[in-house]
Amino acid sequence: MMPKNSRENRAEQLAYLSKVRHQLISSNKVGELILKAKDESLDDKNKANLREMEREYIMSSSLPSDLVEKISSASAKCEGIWEEARKKSDFKTVLPFLEELVILTKQESLILSEKLKCSSYEALINKFEPQANERKIKTIFENLETFLSPLIDQIIDKQKNEEIISISNLMTQEQQKEVGLFLMQKIGFDFNRGRLDTSQHPFCGGAYQDIRITTRYNEIDPFSSLEGIMHETGHAMYELNLPSEWKYQPAGQSRGMAMHESQSLLIEMQITRSKAFKKFLSGILKNNFKFTENCWDTENIYKLEQE
């Protein structure tokens, strides 16, 4: 949605701001203040704030400012090129920019792993999920593999004989947006504090009390668009419902990607893929949006989602 010919300048601006922010957070003065604060008598709320401040300080002070600046610039450039390449499924165009970003990220991971005394992979995980480790993740996936592997075969076998009516090219992009906005409102999204726009991929971002959701529309598979909207609505509602009394404080920010994704997947997977929701959706499509064909019946759209 931003002008593409200004991309290079925006990348430079973001890189500079990232460098300034990094220098402020990683300064010796901040480290001294954190040490002094540890001697204070703090309530639980401010103990949590101090914990998060120290974590951010350790991560930031471990990295040189020029590397932080380079990563920010490379990330902004790569995202801009990817947005154009995504329209044409042109991976070759984005590849060199992605390679540069990967090289810089590996440098970051090596520095952080040495500081945190863990593997490079675990160091990067901790940027997005505090206190996560490879052992914990490995255990979770091993348990999932034991449960899911035989179940997937059973599901595929069951679906072989099911008759499903296609809905391809039966819902325009504008209709998808109208349905998506309607569902967002029903789920409880506050349009006085956020909005929905179009992009090359579903995203959720913004600032306190100002959340922006984007999605892309697919006339071949309209439910992929609707699920994308519902997924990002989950992210948005989590952000909009963080405790207002802790706004702008470290402990009042989202905890990590595991919690964030749990909220988006709760909406997308547990709610919108359930048969109860499909019954609700079928009624909405037929009564409110006049989609009267049999393909919009509850059983058919439920089966479509299970494929």
Regions found by a protein language model. Name each.
Residues 1, 54, 158-160, 209, ...:
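Short acidic (Asp/Glu) and glycine-rich catalytic loops that position anionic groups and cofactors
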Residues 1-130:
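A well-structured
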Residues 5, 199-202, 254, 281-291:
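A glycine-rich phosphate-binding loop feature that marks nucleotide/adenosyl-phosphate handling sites
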Residues 71-223:
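Contiguous, non-catalytic segments that form substrate-binding/exosite surfaces or channel walls
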Residues 113, 224-244, 261-268:
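Active-site recognition of the HExxH zinc-binding catalytic motif
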Residues 186-192, 222, 236-247, 271-278:
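Secondary-structure transition/capping motifs at alpha-helix termini
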Residues 250-261:
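Active-site metal-coordination segments of metallo-dependent hydrolases
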Residues 271-307:
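Long, amphipathic alpha-helical stalk/connector segments used for oligomerization, subunit docking
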